[in-house]
Amino acid sequence: MQVTETLNEGLKREIQVMVPMKDLEAKLNERLDDTKGKIKLNGFRPGKVPSSYLRKMYGKSFMAEVLNEIINDAPRSILVDRNERSAVQPQIDINEDQKVLDGEADFIFNLKYEVLPEFEIKDFKDIEITREIADVSEQEIDEEVKKILSSTRSYSEGDAPSEEGDRVTIDYLGKIDDVPFDGGTGHDVQLVLGSNQFIPGFEEQLVGVKAGDTKAISVKFPDNYGVAHLAGKDAVFNITVKTVSKPDELKIDDEAAKKLGLESLDRLREVVQGQIENQYGLMTRQKIKRQILDSLDADYNFEIPERLVEIEFNNIWAQVNSDLQKSGRSFEDENTTEEKAREEYHMLAQRRVRLGLVLSEIGMKANIQVSESELQTAIFEQVRQYPGQEKEIMNFFRRTPEAIANLRAPIFEEKVIDYLLTHIKIKDKKVTVEELMKEFDESDAIEKSLVKKKTASDNKKSNEIKKKSTMKKV
């Protein structure tokens, strides 16, 4: 097999592979000889079938197997020999030629691929981040406990007009342009006024009604409503009030906690505090991770494989369009254009690919591994999301290596972040809950803003790096 490099520009490689006709002939003869002693054909004794007859019967199919074997094995062996790592599976271009199948020509094909870039991991011990910590107040625990115990609250029917906090039982029929719509009908629906269970403006118009009342209320579905064909539409609901019930006194005591399966009110408070602390901890963790990624992003600006960027962008873009479709919104509603959005998300894809490569390299040098038990836990978490389909989901993961890889990647990334947290400088800072949540909600906008700033400042440097990498042999 003769291997000739035909392109070496930056990370791009093109390789021409030529397998001489005589080598193909030798491999074909091996298969024919192996088959000769095994095959049984009428009119021939075992092992006595002439090679010429076997060639006539099976020559082309055997040669096709030989070619497929070469195509499957060659990319891996070539990359090993060249000490290169391909960013994605190499593209194989084959010039189909009947003469090759007939054993009358050399087999020539081309490999096209991008190599993973080589770069040095910089010292990250000087990275300094701020760990924001929000304490859980007694008031917050009280409010959450009250909210939880409200689900156990009893109500008593009465004749008085409804007030906020009362529970009404209603039938309703919704119409748009005087035509009923799917999902707009309900019978014996219980609704606590002020719970914001329904769209804005709906519950407010039921304050003051009595049992037996009928009422038509006009509302407008929010522009970002989850059902696209209803988003932004005006609707009229014809309401029949069946009962109005006043809330009984809410008891916050051990007996109320026992209704939830807990031994005491103190235990309920412990559970609630733990849940809130876990929620805030996840937010803190996400902000810590963002700071680490921002620091790493500022330190690296090497060329990255275009194909990896394309794959990442396509994933981001599909999610963006799916979110827009579900909300019934457009790019114009988000104060941008599709062209501008594509540019921004393409830069975001570049950032994520580069950071992914940096984290991968750090993890490899630190010998970070994802254990089988960690992977199994992740698989079981996925299975739990599809009750009744456990067997099918498990089989899916068994036969889909890509799905396993998609589960392994975020686990590996989080373990690398854990590793970095033990080697960087961390300064704790007390913040309010509002400060913690406000900045957390703005994180995506912050990330895209950082991408723009970095891209603007690095354009010249990036061009210089590309010129240098074109000359470099990897």
From Swiss-Prot:
PPIase FKBP-type domain location, by residue?
Answer: 165-250
Catalytic activities: [protein]-peptidylproline (omega=180) = [protein]-peptidylproline (omega=0)
Key words of the record: Cell cycle, Cell division, Chaperone, Cytoplasm, Isomerase, Rotamase
The leader peptide range reads: none
Assigned EC number: 5.2.1.8
Query: Where are the annotated segments for Disordered?
Result: 451-474
UniProt keyword Signal, yes or no: no
Regions of compositional bias (Basic and acidic residues) in chain numbering: 451-467
The Gene Ontology CC terms held by the record are: cytoplasm
Chief localization? cytoplasm
| BP GO terms, sorted | 'de novo' cotranslational protein folding; cell division; chaperone-mediated protein folding; protein transport; protein unfolding
Q: Does the keyword Metal-binding apply?
A: no
Protein localization: Cytoplasm
The family classification in the record reads:
Belongs to the FKBP-type PPIase family. Tig subfamily.
Print the domain comment field: Consists of 3 domains; the N-terminus binds the ribosome, the middle domain has PPIase activity, while the C-terminus has intrinsic chaperone activity on its own.
Q: What functional role does this protein have? A: Involved in protein export. Acts as a chaperone by maintaining the newly synthesized protein in an open conformation. Functions as a peptidyl-prolyl cis-trans isomerase.
HAMAP family linked:
Trigger_factor_Tig
Provide the protein name.
Trigger factor
Species per Swiss-Prot/TrEMBL record: Bartonella bacilliformis (strain ATCC 35685 / KC583 / Herrer 020/F12,63)
User: Lineage of the native species?
Assistant: Bacteria, Pseudomonadati, Pseudomonadota, Alphaproteobacteria, Hyphomicrobiales
Please name the gene that encodes this protein. Answer: tig
